[in-house]
Design a protein with these regions (language model features):
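Catalytic core of pol beta-like nucleotidyltransferases
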Residues: 1-22, 30-32, 36, 47-104
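Short beta-strand->loop micro-motif that forms the acidic, two-metal-ion catalytic signature
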Residues: 40-45
């Protein structure tokens, strides 16, 4: 399976379990520098009052299946959208995501 197909399958799977989530691809895959052993880095921003472990597992579960099927490691970070958008300061990580991230 090609990496672009993996990213498309990730997008479709996540939109099924979290239809209003914003999914941002970042890292080597977003920069077009991914190697065969590179992981796929994601930030998943959700519009929930709070983020529970149960809801996180509901979102992540389909990604485990895709990892097994594709052999590519998927590294998701789930955050509340309001916290991401209203953080009090920028970090090197957040600037990196904003500069190179691709919304899926």
């Amino acid at each position: 399976m090609r990496r672009t197909e993996n990213v498309d399958m990730i997008r479709r799977s996540l939109h099924k379990v979290a239809p209003n989530a914003q999914i941002i691809l970042y890292g080597s895959e977003a920069r077009g520098e991914a190697r065969p052993d590179s992981d796929i880095d994601l930030i998943i921003l959700v519009d929930e009052p709070q983020l529970t472990p149960e809801y996180e597992q509901e979102i992540i579960r389909p990604l485990y299946e895709l990892e097994v099927k594709s052999g590519v490691i998927i590294s998701p970070m789930i955050m509340l959208r309001r916290l991401w958008e209203n953080r009090p300061f920028q970090t090197p990580f957040s600037l990196n995501v904003m500069n190179e991230g691709i919304v899926l």
